[in-house]
Amino acid sequence: MKDKSQIRVVVGMSGGVDSSVSAYLLKQQGYDVVGVFMKNWDDKNDSGVCTVTEDYQDVAKVASQIGIPYYSVNFEKEYWDRVFTYFLDEYKNGRTPNPDIMCNKEVKFKAFLDYAMSIDADYIAMGHYAQLRRDEDGRVHLLRGADDNKDQTYFLSQLSQEQLQKVMFPIGHLQKSEVRRIAEEAGLATAKKKDSTGICFIGERNFSKFLGEFLPAQPGEMVTLDGEVKGNHFGLMNYTIGQRKGLGIGGDGKSNEPWFVIGKDLKTNTLLVGQGYHNEHLYANSLDASKLSFVDDISDCGDEFHCTAKFRYRQKDTGVTVKFNEDRTKVEVIFDEPVRAITPGQEVVFYDGEECLGSGTIDHAYKESKLLQYV
């Protein structure tokens, strides 16, 4: 068994408090820690501020404070080729992708992991709110973070056993408030820095405007299922299933209830809308999914198994039955109770209690075996 001082851990440092505390804790525990800042997008935010420069300066400050070397590595090409082109293709096809999941799978835990191994790392570490349990035989289990409100296993659900065996999550057992407290007590420069939001690496900006720079918007009609035109949309890519905001339709019609997106018709470039949060056309009983990835071999589960699932981040778990197709490349997921606004392109993530089993990308939603006109 190596002494901790001989175990090199390369920490992905974003300039935020979570990765700062991750690096600090590992250093305190005696590991050989190296900080690496990933540069994956070359741009300014909507305020004209180059946040990449600011973030790297924060990494430099924290690394100096805790006494570790730090570097910046450019993964712009990998991000564009492996994540952003997929992101754009999904939007072109009327779907709503989750770039953070693909970003973790292809950049943070693949391109970055490969780089870390090239500089003799034993592990990489990230500031994610997730936990790992390691069996005696070396197998790794991905567990929810201790902070229910911050748990990020949803975004890590496409990671493989091989990837996770080389990973540490130093703050996964902590509450966010504890992470802030540790940062403040250690005097870290990022202790009071606000959490980042927005698309992985791209940051906070007007999303429709940003998307329009790469995909020209094609306006069309907003129509009810009865064929009544209610107005015009600004391009199907700007809307997602269950969306209310931005439709610009008053509460007219049969009731005074607000209007929601209930589907998209790509052939006619039509946005389908309906009234009421609990509109029956927003509820599905099942879905099918592909691009499956499981953390560990689940062949002993047979052709079907029961577990819980999430269909979007921070959503309450729903009981489901998962049925594999013949070659186990796709699954049918049947819900214990109807679920609102199942969205093609998003991820269905499977759980067994606290353990994240893996996930698949949602292709279609169904109500009583009838395909819902979501795309």
From Swiss-Prot:
- Its main localization is cytoplasm
Q: Does the keyword Transcription regulation apply?
A: no
- Pfam families linked: tRNA_Me_trans (PF03054), tRNA_Me_trans_C (PF20258), tRNA_Me_trans_M (PF20259)
Function, as annotated: Catalyzes the 2-thiolation of uridine at the wobble position (U34) of tRNA, leading to the formation of s(2)U34.
Q: Which family does it belong to?
A: Belongs to the MnmA/TRMU family.
Disulfide bond residue pairs: C103-C200
Residue sites binding ATP per the record: G12, M13, S14, G15, G16, V17, D18, S19, M38, G127
Keyword tags:
ATP-binding, Cytoplasm, Disulfide bond, Nucleotide-binding, RNA-binding, Transferase, tRNA processing, tRNA-binding
Q: Which domain of life is it from?
A: Bacteria
- Site, Interaction with tRNA: residue positions: H128, Q346
Descriptive protein name: tRNA-specific 2-thiouridylase MnmA
Q: Please give the residue ranges the record annotates as the region Interaction with tRNA.
A: 150-152, 312-313
Instruction: Name the chemical reaction catalysed here.
Output: S-sulfanyl-L-cysteinyl-[protein] + uridine(34) in tRNA + AH2 + ATP = 2-thiouridine(34) in tRNA + L-cysteinyl-[protein] + A + AMP + diphosphate + H(+)
